[in-house]
A protein has these predicted regions:
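Terminal leader/tail segments of proteins
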Residues: 1-106
């Protein structure tokens, strides 16, 4: 995990605003939102701890890296991977794999 991703996860965990380079975290009462290059890529619901993942319109390596860093911190059994230009999300707990859809909640 990259240093910026560790700092991003720490800001989310402690519900603090954070900005470094291309990554911004905004903490609100109901959620903590993550932005990459100004595009909304994730939200953590502070009440239910549900994590909503988005690609922000960009299926870049950096977007996938940020989303995987979030998953590693908040849903460690899940991971996003790519096969033949198609993104999937897998869950090691039950061995499932499904198509990654921007806006999905885990």
């Amino acid at each position: 995990m990259r240093k910026i991703e560790m700092m991003m996860n720490s800001a989310i965990r402690y519900r603090k605003n954070f900005s470094s380079g291309n990554t911004t975290v905004r903490a609100f009462r109901e959620s903590v939102d993550v932005f990459l290059h100004g595009n909304h890529i994730a939200s953590l619901d502070t009440a239910t701890h549900a994590l909503t993942l988005k690609d922000g319109g960009w299926q870049s390596v950096t977007t996938k890296s940020r989303l995987n860093a979030l998953l590693e911190e908040f849903v460690p059994s899940m991971r996003i991977f790519q096969n033949d230009w198609t993104r999937y999300i897998s869950d090691r707990l039950d061995g499932s794999k499904k198509l990654f859809i921007s806006g999905m909640e885990v």
